[in-house]
Amino acid sequence: MTAPAVPPGCPVRPTDTHGLTPLSATTGPDPARVHQELRETWGSVARVELEPGVPAWLVLGYRELLTVTRQEKTYSRDARNWRDLAEGAVPPGSALLPMMAHRDNVIGYDGPEHQRLRRPLVDGMAGTDQRRLRRSVEAVCAGLLESFTGRGTADLVGEYARVVPLLAIGGLFGLDRSEGHELLRSLAALFSGPNASRAGSRRFEDILTGILRERRAAPESDLTSAFLAHPDLRGDSEILQSMVVMISAGNETTTSWIANTLRLMLTDRRFRGRLRGGRLGEDEALDEVLWQDPPMANFPARYALHDTELGGRAIRRGDCLVLGLAAANADPAVRPADPYDMLGNRAHLAFSAGPHACPARVPARLITRTAVEIALRGLPDVTLDVPAAELPWRPSPWTHCPASLPVRFTPLPAAAAAPGGGP
């Protein structure tokens, strides 16, 4: 750890990033070690570097994170309050901007405007037919398993965990499978470099605009029709942005949840034994993953609206604060040492907290639980095809998620992948 020791309460010059730990170090192979070293050096709020020359505060403490997420009049979600961005310290081509720049949607506002834009999302999730969604996810999962069960090998991230959520969420909006796969390709392009990103963004919005037009002409029982009818959404632009937020955010986080649950099954003998032996229910297993590896390890961001103090640190107006969801979950001030003491405990911060907490936790759990159930049933003797220490990790400062899960299993006939099938 190279972060300089600074006495609690001592202000840090906002432009000084010399020796600071890169935020990306907290999502590498051993994030717990990095979190521990940051706590030992800084306490519950640590100074880190987002990218060269761009500092931020990483909120490591559970109670401090609740303070930041619940006090909108002190900590804003609106990136237009970010001093380093406003003063040009963040370059126009920064890789931070896709996640952190202001967006004219529910993510980019606080207060009444945020509440107005959030209501359609909350109402849409409340109106989701859970049985219908589960049947849809089962069919998606079975189809994906069928594509590789006869082969005896697969990548359970690229061929499964990354595909299931987008097809399931796309289905909620009325997209068929071919449109869902095309949406997946456009999302991949979004993160493939500037030229491909622009083309991917255009295609992504084109697909959603198409379904928007179809549902305006002929409404159905899907989220697109619900958004069109919702009185709080004003015009196609707001409807489209709401769709983009739901699909992109839901896909990324649910992918990570599925991937990390499967990874634990393949690499953690204790976790696998408790789940397969019936000592750990499926929902308890999913909650253990949320405590240990939340879908977003770090979440951007809040921006101080005035000078304040947090965790013994002097926070200046315009400072950026990153929500360390994984670190806060592991805060020794609230986390018992014995994992058995966590069974049934959903006080984790995997979905954040406060007014901007995730509104889609119920469908996300349903999609994840179904995907894990069908993978375990359809691949009963699945094993990791590389040493656990050699698993690659996604190069992201935001998610602690394997880039791939190469596995091997006994080849099975296609029918074994269907819901209710298998040995």
List each language-model region with its residue ranges:
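Cytochrome P450
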Residues: 1-423
